[in-house]
Amino acid sequence: MLGRKQSVRNNEDWKNALDHIEETVSKKELDSLVKKTVKDIKEKCKGKKAAYAWSAGKDSLVLGEICEKAGIDQSVLVRCNLEYPAFIAWIEQNKPSGLEIINTGQDMEWLKKHPDMLFPDKSNKAAQWFHIVQHRGQARYYKEHQLEILLLGRRKADGNYVGKD
């Protein structure tokens, strides 16, 4: 098992986990978990305006598939102007049909004024970055679309707060 995402240091570990996934979790067990999760989302979102946050990462790809199965087809991706062009192209080629992209505008000029954000080596700096970009953009989307629920792909195994049941 991989454990915390931050502790996986190379891509080979991810590839190995994928190549041997059925040794860890069977297709039958995975299908059962997906079915249960879809049911839970439907119950919690019934009659509420909901969307999901999509980052184009591994966790959000799974979240998107599950949300779509639960009937939630609106999503948001928050980015800035510091993304690699290849990543932006990948997003355009693979984004969900109901995706809205919010650009919070941080660019090279912004980075020159905030050099401590270039390679944040402390968790509080990384958290500050997520607040500046992700959280503000998600809050804007939530408010503009008058949502009641925004589903996020967070993992307990990584120590993330996942809300109350």
Listing of model-derived features with the role each one plays in the protein:
Residues M1-D165:
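ATP-dependent adenylation/nucleotidyltransferase module used to activate substrates
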